[in-house]
């Protein structure tokens, strides 16, 4: 990896950043944090609402944005995203792979369809995009990849067998990319949150389940999307140049027990 003396700032100003899942939740919060930091944004989501959000950020923060509405589970999507980004910006500095799903049920009830969809969205799709971006970054001379996994990929949680398996696969995949691509000045890291208060998660963690889960977290609360965005921004910056293959747990201490 190339060495750059730390200048006292954590900045991604003028960096070209791809963010998946950018229309909602952690991805949306990450796009906001990156826009505030002056990054050039490629906002990716299946939801067409990402187009309006890209326009909003561009107007509010005077940053260049490129919205891409697509299905990340299709094998050709990664190259399409890379080609469109290269055409507009001429480089890719950061990939924040945030998009994911949480289909939960006890193992005895989980359907094959639920298992396959979870693995497709949470493990295979991130790999396909990382592969396409990685090929580009190798030729370019480096870059930063940050994927959002979960504390569930580190420690088991009941009703989450498919989710846990998919996030554990994602963690293993990113660590392997760090091993293979570090020689090309590419950093590949993960952020693994505890329960994050997004619309998707709030549908899962309700009532007594939420109360009991909070009691297991030493910090006593769930996480907010902007707290995860802050961790992603740090790992995307030059301040994290010597961090590679790390799984940064933003879990309020849940996994130390």
What are these regions (language model features)?
Residues 37-53:
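Conserved glycine-rich Rossmann-like NAD(P)H-binding loop of the short-chain dehydrogenase/reductase
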Residues 89, 127, 142, 221-256:
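C-terminal substrate-recognition "lid" of short-chain dehydrogenase/reductases
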Residues 106-107, 111-116, 201, 213:
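Substrate-binding pocket helix/loop in short-chain dehydrogenase/reductase
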Residues 108, 155-161, 183-184, 220, ...:
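Active-site loop immediately N-terminal to the catalytic Tyr-X3-Lys motif
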Residues 130, 166, 174:
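Active-site helix of classical SDR
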Residues 150:
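Residue(s) in the substrate-gating loop at a strand-loop-helix junction
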Residues 182-187, 243-245:
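Short, small/polar-rich loop/turn modules that mediate ligand/substrate recognition or access, typified
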């Amino acid at each position: 990896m190339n060495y750059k003396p730390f200048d006292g700032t954590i900045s991604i100003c003028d960096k070209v950043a791809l963010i998946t899942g950018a229309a909602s939740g952690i991805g949306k919060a990450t796009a906001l944090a990156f826009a505030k930091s002056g990054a050039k944004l490629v906002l990716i989501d299946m939801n067409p609402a990402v187009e309006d959000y890209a326009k909003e950020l561009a107007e509010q923060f005077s940053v260049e944005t490129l919205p891409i509405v697509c299905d990340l589970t299709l094998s050709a999507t990664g190259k399409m995203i890379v080609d469109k980004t290269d055409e507009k910006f001429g480089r890719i500095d950061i990939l924040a792979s945030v998009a994911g799903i949480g289909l939960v049920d006890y193992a005895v009830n989980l359907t094959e369809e639920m298992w396959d969809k979870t693995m497709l969205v949470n493990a295979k799709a991130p790999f396909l995009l990382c592969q396409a971006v990685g090929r580009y970054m190798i030729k370019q001379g480096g870059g930063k990849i940050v994927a959002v996994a979960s504390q569930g990929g580190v420690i088991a949680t009941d009703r989450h067998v498919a989710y846990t398996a998919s996030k554990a696969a994602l963690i293993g995949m990113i660590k392997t990319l760090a091993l293979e691509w570090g020689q090309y000045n590419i950093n590949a890291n993960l952020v693994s949150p505890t329960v994050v208060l997004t619309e998707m998660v709030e549908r899962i963690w309700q009532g007594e389940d939420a109360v009991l889960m909070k009691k297991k977290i030493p910090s006593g609360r769930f996480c907010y999307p902007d707290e995860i965005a802050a961790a992603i921004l740090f790992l995307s910056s030059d301040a994290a140049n010597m961090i590679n293959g790390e799984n940064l747990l933003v879990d309020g201490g849940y996994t130390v027990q």
